[in-house]
Amino acid sequence: MNTILAQQIANEGGVEAWMMAQQHKSLLRFLTCGSVDDGKSTLIGRLLHDTLQIYEDQLSSLHNDSKRHGTQGEKLDLALLVDGLQAEREQGITIDVAYRYFSTEKRKFIIADTPGHEQYTRNMATGASTCDLAILLIDARKGVLDQTRRHSFISTLLGIKHLVVAINKMDLVDYREETFARIREDYLTFAEQLPGDLDIRFVPLSALEGDNVAAQSANMRWYSGPTLLEVLETVDIQRAVDRQPMRFPVQYVNRPNLDFRGYAGTLASGSVKVGERIKVLPSGVESSVARIVTFDGDKEEACAGEAITLVLNDDIDISRGDLLLAANETLAPARHAAIDVVWMAEQPLAPGQSYDVKLAGKKTRARIEAIRYQIDINNLTQRDVESLPLNGIGLVEMTFDEPLALDIYQQNPVTGGLIFIDRLSNVTVGAGMVRELDERGATPPVEYSAFELELNALVRRHFPHWDARDLLGDKHGAA
C-alpha cells in the first residue's frame, strides 16, 4: 500500500474521516506543455514520486521498465509513469493526453500531460480546455522555441490566466543564474503579445534530479522563490464563471415516471436558488425553480460546476440543448459569430464548407463564411489565408442554421466553446471559441397573422393558467 496514504488515513482517524477531508480540499486542474523532450512527463513523474504518491508495486514495475525502455541510464526514468502507450515508450515521446491525480495536505490536483510534437498540437488543445493553470517547460539549453510560443498562445486562447514557466534541465547548464535570467527575459518579451491579463511565474528546476520541484534546491541558492509544488499549492485561482450570470445548459430531460419531470445538467456559471424566476432559450418562456435535486438530496442553492437536476413549477417545453438563465437576463440568440478556431483535421478548413457543431449539448449545422486571418505562432502576427491547415489557428466567420444562445468564450467557456464535427465521418475536426457575436445575430421581430393574434388573445382570455405570452407585447398594452 502507498505508505503516505496509509499515514494520512491514520492521521485523519480512519478512511471516512480522510475521505471527508479530501472533499473539502480545493481542486486545481493544470497541464504541462512545451516543446518535445523538454521533460514534461519526467516532471509529472517527479511530482508523483516526491509527494510519495507511487505504490510499491508501481515503483517495482518502474525499475523494470526503466531497464527496458528508460532513457536515463542507471537512473529511474520517471517519465514512464505517465507515458503509458507502447508507441510512446518505444519512441520516448508523449502522443496522447495522459491524466493523473494526486493530492497533498493543502490541495487536490488533476494533471494533464500533453504532447510536445507539433503534429499533436490538437491533443494539447484538448488537454488545455479544462485546465486552470499551465506549466510551460523550457529546456535551459534551448531557450524559448516555436512550440513553446504555440502552447503559450493556445493556453491563453483557451482562457488559462495562470502560467508557470518551468525552466527545466538546469543541471545540464551547471545551474547558472544567467541562463535562467536570459530565458526569463526572452519569455517576458514574447508574453507581451499574449492576450489577457496573465499571472506569469518562473521556477528554475531539474525534473530529473528533483531540484526545486517539491523541495528547495541546494544547487541554486541564488533562487529564493517557491518550489514548483509550493506554487501549485498556493496559487489563487479565480474562476470567471463564478462571477458570471447564471447559465444552465440542459443535457438531459429526466422523466423516470409521470410524477417527476426534471432537467439535468451542470451549472455552467453563476448560481440558482429555489423560487428563482428563470427563462428558457430559445423559446423565451419563463417559469420558477421548484426544486434543486442532487445525488445527495435536495438543495436550496447551487453554484457553478455542480451537477444538478432542476424541477420547475410549470410544465413547459424544454429539451436537450436549451439554455436556462435568470428571467431578468438578456441574451439574444445569434446566427452569426466570429470564432477562434484550432483546426484538427488533415483536410483544411475553407470558406463554403459546412459542419455539424456542438455547443453545451446543442447540436446544429454551421457554414464557414470567411477566414479573417491565420495566426503565425512564431511572432503572433496575422496573415491572410485561403484555408486553415492541420494545427492552424485562426479567426473564422460562421453562420449557424438556427439562432444559438452564445456567450463570449473568455466570459463563459461552456456557452462560448464549441466543437466542429465532420458530417460524414462524425469525427471531431476542430475546436472553436466565440470571440465576437455579430449584430446581425439578434432575432428579428416576428410578424404574426391576424388569425395567430386572435387565437393568442382567445387562449389568454379563456386559459390564463397556461401562461401564454402576449404576442403583441407592449403594443397590446398601449392599445
Swiss-Prot record:
Q: What is its EC number?
A: 2.7.7.4
- Spell out the protein name for this chain: Sulfate adenylyltransferase subunit 1
In residue numbers, the region (G2) covers 92-96
Residues where GTP binds: 34-41, 113-117, 168-171
Q: Where is this region: G4?
A: 168-171
Q: Where is this region: G5?
A: 206-208
Keyword annotations for this protein, in alphabetical order, are: ATP-binding, GTP-binding, Nucleotide-binding, Nucleotidyltransferase, Transferase
